[in-house]
Amino acid sequence: MLTQSSFWRSLYRLIHIYAGIFIAPFILFAAITGLLYAITPQFEQAIYKDVLYVEPLNQTPHKLSQQIEAAKQVMPKSAQVIEVRPAPSSDQTTRVIFSDSIHDFTSEAVFIDPFTLKVQGHLAVYGTSGVLPFRTTLDQLHSNLLLGKWGRFYSELAASWLAILTLTGLYNWWKRRQNLKIRQTQKNKLLRWHSTLGLTLFPLLLLIAITGLTWSEWAGDNIRVARQWLNWQTPTLAISLQTDNLPTVMHHEHHEMPHSENLNLNIVSTEYDTALSIARAHGIDAAQIQIKPPTSGNQAWTIAEIQRKWPTQADSIAIDMEQHKVIDQLAFKDYSLVAKLTRWGVDAHIGVLFGWINQLVLALYAFALCIMII
């Protein structure tokens, strides 16, 4: 007769075994595509080198408004600027991003040499992170198998069961650790290797599973509801110029870029110069920033820092351009601990938080996970 202890031991063992048989292939595919995604920044910079980089000149760059006008020359008159990312350094281009009413979640970015106003090229960019086509393909392969919404079942399944496999694996190791040391069979040797890798990767396995679930289709929605209920959500700028402030929606990597519903606001390019000047005067000092014009007449301009590499710079500001007045400002240092951990967790998951070291750790993790599964 099974005791309560042996019942639970058998149950967790069976869960681990059968999940390994039926779910591990999905986790293996996620690990392989995650490994490829982790090393894409270097490939992306090489593939799009002529678009992303310029020869720095010993002169002052042209005004941002002039760069925007240069970008408009190669786009249809109906195209509307929805975002501008000034060149973060003297050897990089400025991105002027236009709406794309045809393709969901993508926009068209025109890359401008800030010194010569030459158009270096234009590419489709995806999501609020502005990911370029090569990485977009790998991103979607990793997150939805290139199958759209229904493909997200796979990644949610992989992330959910990765956490379960990790915890049941730890439990099984704890209960069998003495037997593995005493009985020197070939099977036990393999189990020891499997257990050693699992224990070594344990913190990363949970981190990847949890951060992966935060932007999943169904669990992600529940996590956002729970964070809101616990008052752990990421703070949002008040961008409404009326008393009933309407918040912006702050997305992370992998999320969609919503298209504006009303872009006919007669915005002139020189307003970008003014917005940039006001933002710099109010402490928005990161090299990587994005400037977004309002999408309706009762909304403010928003300027946000988008430096995801440590130390994170994610301050943001909302400006009433009619009065040249700041109506709201958020500083990353004032975020709650949970909001900061969410930001850092997501950035670590996609390999940008600690640069090449982050990428190397993720690549080694993905490789070791593949070995564990195989």
Regions found by a protein language model. Give the residues of each.
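Conserved histidines in hydrophobic membrane contexts and catalytic metal-binding motifs
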Residues: 1-374
